[in-house]
Amino acid sequence: MSEYVWHPTPEFTEHGNIAAFCRKHGIDGGYRELQNRSVTHPQWFWERAAADIGIVWHTPPRRVCDDTGGIASTRWFPGGRTNLVDSCLHRHLRQGRGRAPALRWEREDGTKGVLTYDEVAARSARVAGGLRALGVAEGDRVAGYLPAGPEAFVLLFACARIGAVLVPLFSGFGTEAIAVRLVDAGARVLVTAAAATRHGRRYDMETVARTALAKATCVRHLVVVREEPGAPPDPSGQSRRNMPSAPVGAGATPRASRPSWAGDVSQDEPTASPGPATTTWHRLSGAEPAETVSLPTGTPFLLLHTSGTTGRPKGTIHTHGGFPVQVGSETRYNLDLRPDDVAFWVTDPGWIMFPLVAVGATLAGACVLAYQGTIDHPDVTRLWRLLDDHGVTVFGSSPSLARMLMGRDPKHPAPSRLRVLGSTGEPWTEEAWRWYFADFGGKRCPVINICGGTEVGGSLLASAPTLPQSPCSFSGPCLGIDAAIEDDQDTEPPEGHVGELVVRHSWPGMTRGLWRARERFADTYFGRRPGRWSHGDLVSRTGDEWFVHGRLDDIIKVAGKRLGPAEVEDAVVGDPAVAEAAAVGIPHPVKGEALWCFAVPAAGQPLGAPEAERIRGRVAHALGPAFRPSRVVAVPELPRTRNGKVMRRLIRSLVTGEALGDLSTLVNPAGLDAIRTALQEQ
């Protein structure tokens, strides 16, 4: 363990949210005692945390959780009814805080604005009414392909208000990635921006969305967010500015709501349609307001895909009851969010951190900053101006972003109002962590590391602002999380030794399953260690602190963006020059990982520099520019196990020079020599 470099101040130990909770409930030993009690008496903790967070129950739950079916089938807050919109928005209006800012936003071109809690509530009610007019009923899926901004923020609450399920899509995805997720979700509506701006360039999102819809015939309606004057032309070349949009409700086929969903993750298969009708966000948001519906606590509001190492992306399911309690706990106690805070996390509406911060901050009565664009345009000081101009007090980032900023060596004072720094997405290097703490944060802010994921609905490990910190460390498991470290023999390794992060009991934010994949859910998270959640992160413990070292699987993380190799490989083998492919993440000093593709040429086909460049373009087109491969390497064969699985870890080790480890399952060792030769020659 390194020396402690940050020690808690009275702002947190006396005046913070953890301190207030401990005083109220007679916890004299601070965070450590509270964490222990929250694990040994989880029903005691979550009942009191939900009240402290401000969860509004329309009907109080019969109990906190029902785990009689085992960890994988735990039901949280059974018998209760709620709607997260009441907890996040209406509660503040009833308390007279409707004029408080809920969202500040800014675009790369300098356009900015503020929405109050009153305005978010009113706008989300009208958008919800517009969705209702399109035939959206409780349980229907509404996808959002949007950059960060007021529309993405309002859409989240609009869907929740009427019991629709939001399907967020990364704004940098290409057509294939979008289509796969739309079809898997059976989305009925897609909301897209006409365009977004990054690095001063305009990116046409509407054309990407329309191309994806050709393969996603389940979508009945396309809603386009465009500037009302000067709308961009449609793909046919005709201007859409004066073309009548399909009226809200045109072609809609109303369906009965499905409140019985809570016990069934197998929805109806998507149905084909002749093509989506188009309307605009402006028309949608002009509808009659919809009332907020009361829902069983197990009703889903979020279907968010995460990528695995094999197969299609996995659809995780988060609910009106469990998700707000989980993220409310983390943002209230670990990030110490308060009503006068402005929270800014560098993320995208397609990733878990956007709904986590949106829901967590509004539960606290705080304000969210959403920024559309790149934070280093026109230069790297843009981020500091954003933080100062909007009075950001709680800022979250990835280690990749910190490394990028550190590499440019900006000489800029720490933002004056910052009081908490957050971090997630990947492990830190000590040099980057120290820069983030000292240079960026001015040595006065705790660095709240969080480790979780899309399927977690929040975090499993986190830092606490009431405890001292050493570089790169976590204080340990989050409140209410019964986490442990286990080796391959299912025992706890010695202090300082690495094992897998596991969880022994359910938590409120845990995904309710995988969309249309009950068996896959059980196999993925509970198959290797029955009765325990296997998270796949490699972690260790030294003293009271925990450290994260990476992943067990082959997930690729490019600048904090997660991608499974199967999606990349699908794009690569779509090229006529390629017979087989393997995608791996290779350590990169700024991005965290760079994407490398290894391709076996098709019979009689060349695979040289021109073909490699073409393949790189294919991947970027299919999955988005962020996932453009750094290298495409032609190889005669890929290393495989006896059952035919590609051993990506060996390919990665050949590039990095790491030890190859166990080769007992490798059936073609000569292939390793061929890859070594290819790396030297190309």
List PLM regions with ranges.
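Conserved AMP-binding/adenylate-forming core of the ANL superfamily
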Residues: 34-37, 85-86, 103-157, 174-179, ...
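Conserved pre-ATP/AMP-binding loop-to-beta segment of ANL
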Residues: 99-101, 237, 263, 274-305, ...
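AMP-binding/adenylate-forming catalytic core of the ANL superfamily
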Residues: 144, 169-194, 388, 395, ...
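Adenylate-forming
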Residues: 147, 189-208, 229, 371-376, ...
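Structural core segment of the AMP-binding/adenylate-forming
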Residues: 157, 161-249, 253-280, 391, ...
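AMP-binding/adenylate-forming catalytic domain of the ANL superfamily
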Residues: 224, 590, 621-646, 658-681
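Conserved AMP-binding/adenylation subdomain of ANL enzymes
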Residues: 324-342, 352-393, 408
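Conserved AMP-binding/adenylate-forming
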Residues: 371, 388, 421, 428-546, ...
